[in-house]
Amino acid sequence: MAETAPLRVQLIARTEFTVPPDVPWETDAEGGAALVEFAGRACYQSWSKPNPRTATNASYLRHIIDVGHLSVLEHASVSFYITGISRSCTHELIRHRHFSYSQLSQRYVPENDSQVVVPPGIEGDAELEGLFTAAADASRAAYAELLAKLEAKLMGDEPREGRATLRRKQARQAARSVLPNATETRIVVTGNYRAWRHFIAMRASEHADLEIRRLAIACLRELVAVAPAVFADFEIYPLADGTEVATTPLVTEA
């Protein structure tokens, strides 16, 4: 029986920032948030912080977002390693073209023991989960049988390791066609702050597919911990059905 994989979002990289020694400026933040403020002040050379209403990093970044000067958010970035996500969900995720992606390859990695992600609409219903599990198991059995026969067919009398590696890839790329969209995949996603804000605004919405909405909420929680001045304006709240959404009163895209 196929095992299920829980969603996991792990922070693996974030922006660091060093103030140039010849710039007479300091701030009360660090990392990406400091870099965003520096970039904004560089446009106007406002190192002395002439406006007391934007003298702190948090107040400056809130003003930047509120007026839609979002380009400065593009200087700072965050990378996540995401597991327990379905192939169908990553098909939606990769439509966000300002992110960079590195995803598990089904040509190089055999999927005989792959896990599955139970769709939220099926989750918790014993009858539906039974049907889902049976279908997933049948797909994996077909994959294993196809893979074995394709490898036997393609290998032929070519014992050389280089050719054998190629033939195995060719067998996997053909056999994977029967794997379900619910097959778990793993992916590294890197995006700048502006791209992440856009993603959260689009995918943490009630109108988004529930699996990618859960992903957006999980990413948001990590992003708020990394750069609260940039992401804490998003409020997470529950809906009547027990799921969560996130919204912000500020500008998400100019």
Curated annotation (Swiss-Prot):
Pathway: Pyrimidine metabolism; dTTP biosynthesis
CDD domains cross-referenced by the UniProt entry: ThyX
Keywords from the UniProt entry: FAD, Flavoprotein, Methyltransferase, NADP, Nucleotide biosynthesis, Transferase
Molecular-function GO term, any one: thymidylate synthase activity
Motif interval(s): ThyX motif: 95-105
Residue stretches making up the ThyX domain: 7-237
EC number from the UniProt entry: 2.1.1.148
Protein residues bound to dUMP: 92-95, 103-107, 176, 203
Residues that hold FAD according to the record: 71, 95-97, 103, 192-194, 198
Enzymatic reactions: dUMP + (6R)-5,10-methylene-5,6,7,8-tetrahydrofolate + NADPH + H(+) = dTMP + (6S)-5,6,7,8-tetrahydrofolate + NADP(+)
Active-site residues, record numbering mapped to chain: 203 (involved in ionization of n3 of dump, leading to its activation)
UniProt record, GO biological process: dTMP biosynthetic process; dTTP biosynthetic process; methylation
Tagged with keyword Iron: no
UniProt-listed PROSITE patterns: THYX (PS51331)
Cofactors: FAD
Similarity comment text for this entry: Belongs to the thymidylate synthase ThyX family.
NCBIfam families xrefs: thyX
Subunit description: Homotetramer.
The protein, known as: Flavin-dependent thymidylate synthase
Originating gene: thyX
